[in-house]
Amino acid sequence: MSNNPRSQVITQGTQRSPNRAMLRAVGFGDDDFTKPIVGIANGYSTITPCNMGINDLALRAEAGLRTAGAMPQLFGTITISDGISMGTEGMKYSLVSREVIADSIETVCNGQRMDGVLAIGGCDKNMPGAMIAMARLNIPSIFVYGGTIKPGHYAGEDLTVVSAFEAVGQYSAGKIDEETLYGIERNACPGAGSCGGMFTANTMSSAFEAMGMSLPYSSTMAAVDGEKADSTEESAKVLVEAIKKQILPSQILTRKAFENAIAVIMAVGGSTNAVLHLLAIANTIGVPLSLDDFETIRHKVPVLCDLKPSGKYVTTNLHAAGGIPQVMKILLVNGILHGDALTITGQTIAEVLADIPDQPPAGQDVIHSWDDPVYQEGHLAVLKGNLATEGSVAKISGVKKPVITGPAKVFESEEDCLEAILAGKIQAGDVVVVRYEGPKGGPGMREMLAPTSAIIGAGLGDSVGLITDGRFSGGTYGLVVGHVAPEAYVGGAIALVQEGDQITIDAGKRLLQLNISEEELAQRRAQWTPPQPRYPRGILAKYAKLVSSSSLGAVTDIDLF
């Protein structure tokens, strides 16, 4: 087989002389038309620190591809800054951007008949967007993470961007003064890189390394360190070899790979968003995966890493302690991982991990041993009940009170909820309900970091529950339940909750229950009327029309016909 099985349709034969003429203008010579054409999907942007260092990595990828005998073609894709848009209408576009990224990469790579793709991303939706595209394309592909930010420092404390969100709640509750708030703001984000705890970006990069779609150690490197650029160039060379061997995403993204990724996410204490994104990727590649699979694996895998948001350390500390390979080796020797799963290098997981020690290094407490975990079971629990018949997702690590029954405080939007919290209207024992924030209802399934951080900052994190058909940031922790499905917009039971209703959240029993009779619930459902769409035109209108339930990954290309 040739090394350019797809691009030869635009580079070979007399009929393609005009095509070659245009390629010559962008740097192709006579000897280049038989080389594989590899796209570099470049997520560079100066709107967020997550992506502002990516262009330098794209240039290193370009150099690596040329050295390995390929012809690189660099193109841009978008990003939304979750952290900057958080708490605003702009956050509705965050999950939408995952689909735009996937669509854009698929469009360029198929339109230009590229033989492979190397995608570089930083902010949260860059990773799943790129992976969905790779799954659709099914051409040799590799993902390069832009890298994590280093921690900020203030008053002797390590900071992340979540520190700034929580400081708002602390300030509103009178726990810190304005000078401290300003000091945290100025020091939380010291430079380039994605948010530094085991938040969504670092969770997804870790998952992709565990699945074999990124190189070992690459998911926890700091954006500003030289090893990140070196790893990017090496990724390019590995991709060219994968093109020669025709190692495809469909061979890597198997059921075993998804189970490996879920296990690693549990072990590192990763974000609830990983559930949504892995469901979407699996749906795209055709691998059966459901919420129940996360619950099954959760009971087998302890939390091994003491990482923020609920823990002590940040991702650069994890990297120094051995990174994802060390975590994976512990899981492998304890029978959790599928060692025969293939990676983009052509090696199996077991072969990649062969030289990694079975135990974490001494003198550190970032990565714990199997026998001395941070928590005995995984932290991402799937809750069901009459409020979530399709399921919901809760992050239960660090929760001191895993059960709450209390009166509902109902809000139709995130903004109304945050205003009430900051005004002191939420009391210990309340269960906050934020609805019509789901994939269709928002639309866009916003993350609720602002209200959850305000609850934490106000000192109510152990005594107030929050449920929503929206999402949570990877920086969220506490007794919070998201991804409630069916969502309010389609008539899910969360739409039927009334102010003062008693709601039970029981993480141990994995129960989310509205404590009214079935007869009362049926009467309310009969009286419910669907709301009018919030957006009649534009991308949010299109998204609301197409998007599936969060229990299916909130994808936009199923059941279209």
Swiss-Prot record:
<keyword id="KW-0479">Metal-binding</keyword>
<keyword id="KW-0028">Amino-acid biosynthesis</keyword>
<comment type="pathway">
    <text>Amino-acid biosynthesis; L-valine biosynthesis; L-valine from pyruvate: step 3/4.</text>
</comment>
<keyword id="KW-0456">Lyase</keyword>
<dbReference type="InterPro" id="IPR056740">
    <property type="entry name" value="ILV_EDD_C"/>
</dbReference>
<keyword id="KW-0100">Branched-chain amino acid biosynthesis</keyword>
<dbReference type="Pfam" id="PF24877">
    <property type="entry name" value="ILV_EDD_C"/>
</dbReference>
<feature type="binding site">
    <location>
        <position position="124"/>
    </location>
    <ligand>
        <name>Mg(2+)</name>
    </ligand>
</feature>
<dbReference type="InterPro" id="IPR000581">
    <property type="entry name" value="ILV_EDD_N"/>
</dbReference>
<dbReference type="GO" id="GO:0009099">
    <property type="term" value="P:L-valine biosynthetic process"/>
</dbReference>
<keyword id="KW-0001">2Fe-2S</keyword>
<dbReference type="GO" id="GO:0004160">
    <property type="term" value="F:dihydroxy-acid dehydratase activity"/>
</dbReference>
<comment type="function">
    <text>Functions in the biosynthesis of branched-chain amino acids. Catalyzes the dehydration of (2R,3R)-2,3-dihydroxy-3-methylpentanoate (2,3-dihydroxy-3-methylvalerate) into 2-oxo-3-methylpentanoate (2-oxo-3-methylvalerate) and of (2R)-2,3-dihydroxy-3-methylbutanoate (2,3-dihydroxyisovalerate) into 2-oxo-3-methylbutanoate (2-oxoisovalerate), the penultimate precursor to L-isoleucine and L-valine, respectively.</text>
</comment>
<comment type="subunit">
    <text>Homodimer.</text>
</comment>
<dbReference type="GO" id="GO:0009097">
    <property type="term" value="P:isoleucine biosynthetic process"/>
</dbReference>
<dbReference type="InterPro" id="IPR042096">
    <property type="entry name" value="Dihydro-acid_dehy_C"/>
</dbReference>
<comment type="similarity">
    <text>Belongs to the IlvD/Edd family.</text>
</comment>
<feature type="binding site">
    <location>
        <position position="123"/>
    </location>
    <ligand>
        <name>[2Fe-2S] cluster</name>
    </ligand>
</feature>
<feature type="binding site">
    <location>
        <position position="195"/>
    </location>
    <ligand>
        <name>[2Fe-2S] cluster</name>
    </ligand>
</feature>
<dbReference type="InterPro" id="IPR020558">
    <property type="entry name" value="DiOHA_6PGluconate_deHydtase_CS"/>
</dbReference>
<dbReference type="InterPro" id="IPR037237">
    <property type="entry name" value="IlvD/EDD_N"/>
</dbReference>
<dbReference type="InterPro" id="IPR050165">
    <property type="entry name" value="DHAD_IlvD/Edd"/>
</dbReference>
<feature type="binding site">
    <location>
        <position position="447"/>
    </location>
    <ligand>
        <name>Mg(2+)</name>
    </ligand>
</feature>
<dbReference type="Pfam" id="PF00920">
    <property type="entry name" value="ILVD_EDD_N"/>
</dbReference>
<keyword id="KW-0411">Iron-sulfur</keyword>
<keyword id="KW-0408">Iron</keyword>
<feature type="modified residue" description="N6-carboxylysine">
    <location>
        <position position="125"/>
    </location>
</feature>
<feature type="active site" description="Proton acceptor">
    <location>
        <position position="473"/>
    </location>
</feature>
<dbReference type="GO" id="GO:0009082">
    <property type="term" value="P:branched-chain amino acid biosynthetic process"/>
</dbReference>
<dbReference type="GO" id="GO:0051537">
    <property type="term" value="F:2 iron, 2 sulfur cluster binding"/>
</dbReference>
<dbReference type="GO" id="GO:0000287">
    <property type="term" value="F:magnesium ion binding"/>
</dbReference>
<feature type="binding site" description="via carbamate group">
    <location>
        <position position="125"/>
    </location>
    <ligand>
        <name>Mg(2+)</name>
    </ligand>
</feature>
<feature type="binding site">
    <location>
        <position position="50"/>
    </location>
    <ligand>
        <name>[2Fe-2S] cluster</name>
    </ligand>
</feature>
<feature type="binding site">
    <location>
        <position position="82"/>
    </location>
    <ligand>
        <name>Mg(2+)</name>
    </ligand>
</feature>
<keyword id="KW-0460">Magnesium</keyword>
<protein>
    <recommendedName>
        <fullName>Dihydroxy-acid dehydratase</fullName>
        <ecNumber>4.2.1.9</ecNumber>
    </recommendedName>
</protein>
<dbReference type="InterPro" id="IPR004404">
    <property type="entry name" value="DihydroxyA_deHydtase"/>
</dbReference>
<comment type="pathway">
    <text>Amino-acid biosynthesis; L-isoleucine biosynthesis; L-isoleucine from 2-oxobutanoate: step 3/4.</text>
</comment>
